[in-house]
Every structure is written in structure tokens, then in C-alpha cells.
């Protein structure tokens, strides 16, 4: 033990002598000398490490020290390259994946999380609000009315052994704001239920015009559309037959179903069928891709007069009694089956 202490004292004495001689010779700062190299080689590695200050300035009281093996947070790594304001740092995404905006990011998110938006459209007095209330009040599932909205209902339902979130909007007619809300429906809806009353032929005659408006608002999307003949329980007041509704659906390439919101007849089948139609259309869109925008290599086509929606609707109605009834019968054979395209 005395030998080790004497050796350490000798090393310290040589180090002091080396520092004194270096100061007298006024060697440039940082210039190595043979005497310094010899002294460093004689010292023990433990002593050299103890003399080195690897931790920097002492941490402030109460601040936890970070281990050398712990990675620096990603936010501070970015700050080394450029200044990052704490207020501008994006917050972590919420588990629910909700958002106030209705952009493409949210559209992709809703598709991933199984959220489907269904719009009820049609003339007034056909039973849209009754259908929406029936959907929100069906027993056996979790249903509630969304906050700050009297005409929007959200439910978790099971469709083909898969749980989804279905949101039903009844905002097609809202007084002075009806025009803006209708445009909002056109851009955000995943499926559209055109409701008409089987006791009102005048409202039934406006279905083609409503459908043309939907497709004109989103011309390059394969939108699921279901024609809903409501109030089927009023047999004595019926003005539109089941066959007429199916013929119209076959002509317009839509689905068709008759319901009675008052008796809850076919209401569950309607909304579950809407979910199936959305899935089928999305699956076909992913397989074949969206239809490309129309373009011409010779430049834009000259402007032409567009046919009004009223004239188009009249033309559709003129074809309700087809020349080849057998062809339209085959075409409308599966329009009532909401589980197929």
C-alpha cells in the first residue's frame, strides 16, 4: 500500500514539474510535448477518466439527469438544426381520430376507422325525419344524438360481423341555409338515400332530378344511391306501386327498397344495406381505380349549352314505360338486393 501511495505522489510531483516547465517555455496552447506524453502514459486509466469532465456543467437542482445511453428527444434533435417554437409543435393524435375539418385527410381516416356518413335527401313531408329518428331510437344498439345537432344521429352497428360507426344526416332542408347544407351533403356523403312517399306521385316524379343533382355535384365518384319508398303501410293511399319504384331504380342504376318508418318496417335493412353498398363501391373503386378526369389532347372542348335538370328528369320519366319491358325487368331484378352491386 505504501508503494502505491509513493507512486501516486511521484506522478503528481512530475505532473506539477511538467506544468511549471511548460509555463516557463510558453508553449503554444494545445501543443503536445514529449514530457507530457510520457507523464500521461504513466498515469492509470482510472485516474485519467476521473480528471476528465464528461458531464458538462452541473445540472440545475431538481432537474433529472439523462443517461448517456438515453436518446435525445426527437423534438430537440430538430431544434439543433433549426429553431422550433413550442407552440407550433403538433400535438399528439387523439385515440378517437376525430377532427373538425372535412378534408381529404379526414376522409381517409374515416374510411380506415369504419365511419360511414349517410345523407337523407328528398322532398319535404316524405318521412326523412321520421326515418332518422327511427334509426337513432332503434333498441338493442348504442345510439345517441350528436352534440349541437338536432338532425344528426350516430350509432355503432354490426354489419356482416363487423362493427361500424354509421352517421345519418337529415339536413337536406334547413330553411335559408338549405342551399349551403345541400352542397355540404354532396361533398361529404358516403351514400345517399333519396326518400319519396308512395302516397305522393308528384314527389316520386322529382326523384330523377334529385339524383341528377347528386351525380352532377360529384361526377367522378361511384356514389351508392338507394331509392326509398316510404309510408308503405298506407296501402289505401298508395299512388306509386312497387313495380314502378323498381323500374325507376333500374333505369337510374340505383337500389330500391320500401319502408315504413312509423312501423319500423325495413328500417334496419335499409341502413345496414347502405353500409354494404358503401363497402361494395369502395372495394370496386380500389380494385379498378377511380375514373380519370375527362381530357382531350386537342385542348378543352368548346362550350356547349347544358341540358337543364328539369329536361333531363322529364326524359328519364318518359322512359319509365320502356319499349323492351323484358330488358328492364332483368335490369331491375336485383335492384332490391342491397347486398350486391
Swiss-Prot record:
| GO MF annotations in UniProt | GTP binding; GTPase activity
**Which compartments is it annotated to reside in?**
Cell membrane
Say if the entry is tagged with keyword Endoplasmic reticulum: no
The biased composition feature labelled Low complexity covers 90-106
* Keywords, in A-Z order: Cell membrane, GTP-binding, Membrane, Nucleotide-binding, Phosphoprotein
Q: Which gene encodes it?
A: Rem2
UniProt modified residues of type Phosphoserine: 27, 296
According to its UniProt record, which protein family does this protein belong to? Belongs to the small GTPase superfamily. RGK family.
Q: Is Membrane set as a keyword in this record?
A: yes
Query: Cross-referenced InterPro entries, in alphabetical order?
Result: P-loop_NTPase (IPR027417), RGK_GTP-binding_reg (IPR051641), Sigma_54_int_dom_ATP-bd_1 (IPR025662), Small_GTPase (IPR001806)
Q: Which GO terms describe its cellular component?
A: plasma membrane
Primary location group: membrane
The cross-references to SUPFAM superfamilies, in alphabetical order and at most eight, read: P-loop containing nucleoside triphosphate hydrolases (SSF52540)
Q: Please name the CDD domains in this protein's record.
A: RGK
Q: What Gene3D superfamilies does the database record attribute to this sequence?
A: P-loop containing nucleotide triphosphate hydrolases
Q: Where is this region: Disordered?
A: 1-71, 84-106, 282-309
Biased region (Acidic residues) positions are 1-13
Function description? Binds GTP saturably and exhibits a low intrinsic rate of GTP hydrolysis.
Its recorded name reads GTP-binding protein REM 2
Q: Which domain of life is it from?
A: Eukaryota
Point to the regions of Polar residues compositional bias: 18-30
What PANTHER family does the database record attribute to this sequence? Answer: GTP-BINDING PROTEIN REM 2 (PTHR45775:SF5), RAD, GEM/KIR FAMILY MEMBER 2, ISOFORM C (PTHR45775)
Biased composition of type Pro residues is found at: 294-303
Instruction: Enumerate the residues binding GTP.
Output: 122-129, 230-233, 261-262
Amino acid at each position: 500500500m505504501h508503494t502505491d501511495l509513493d507512486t501516486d505522489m511521484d506522478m503528481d510531483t512530475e505532473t506539477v514539474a511538467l506544468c511549471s516547465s511548460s509555463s516557463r517555455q510558453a508553449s503554444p496552447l494545445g501543443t503536445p510535448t514529449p514530457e507530457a506524453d510520457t507523464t500521461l502514459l504513466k498515469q492509470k486509466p482510472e485516474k485519467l477518466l476521473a480528471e476528465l469532465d464528461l458531464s458538462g456543467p452541473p445540472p440545475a437542482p431538481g432537474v433529472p439527469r439523462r443517461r448517456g445511453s438515453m436518446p435525445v428527444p426527437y423534438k430537440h434533435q430538430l431544434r439543433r438544426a433549426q429553431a422550433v417554437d413550442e407552440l407550433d409543435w403538433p400535438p399528439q393524435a387523439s385515440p378517437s381520430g376525430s377532427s373538425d375539418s372535412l378534408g381529404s385527410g379526414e376522409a381517409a381516416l374515416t374510411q380506415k376507422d369504419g365511419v360511414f356518413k349517410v345523407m337523407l335527401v328528398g322532398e319535404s313531408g316524405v318521412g326523412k325525419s321520421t326515418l332518422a329518428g327511427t334509426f337513432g331510437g332503434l333498441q338493442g344498439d348504442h345510439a345517441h344524438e350528436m352534440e349541437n345537432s338536432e338532425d344528426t344521429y350516430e350509432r355503432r352497428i354490426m354489419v356482416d360481423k363487423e362493427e361500424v360507426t354509421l352517421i345519418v344526416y337529415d339536413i337536406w332542408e334547413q330553411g335559408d341555409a338549405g342551399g349551403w347544407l345541400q352542397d355540404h351533403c354532396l361533398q361529404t356523403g358516403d351514400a345517399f338515400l333519396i326518400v319519396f312517399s308512395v302516397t305522393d306521385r308528384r314527389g316520386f316524379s322529382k326523384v330523377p332530378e334529385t339524383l341528377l343533382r347528386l351525380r352532377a355535384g360529384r361526377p367522378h365518384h361511384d356514389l351508392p344511391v338507394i331509392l326509398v319508398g316510404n309510408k308503405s303501410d298506407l296501402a289505401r293511399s298508395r299512388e306509386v306501386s312497387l313495380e314502378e319504384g323498381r323500374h325507376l331504380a333500374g333505369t337510374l342504376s340505383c337500389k330500391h327498397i320500401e319502408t315504413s318508418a312509423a312501423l319500423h318496417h325495413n328500417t334496419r335493412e335499409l341502413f345496414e344495406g347502405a353500409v354494404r353498398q358503401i363497402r361494395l363501391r369502395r372495394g370496386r373503386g380500389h380494385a379498378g381505380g377511380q375514373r380519370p378526369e375527362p381530357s382531350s389532347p386537342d385542348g378543352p372542348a368548346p362550350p356547349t349549352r347544358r341540358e337543364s335538370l328539369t329536361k333531363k328528369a322529364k326524359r328519364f320519366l318518359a322512359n319509365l314505360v320502356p319499349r323492351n319491358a323484358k330488358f328492364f325487368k332483368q335490369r331491375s331484378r336485383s335492384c332490391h338486393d342491397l347486398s350486391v352491386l
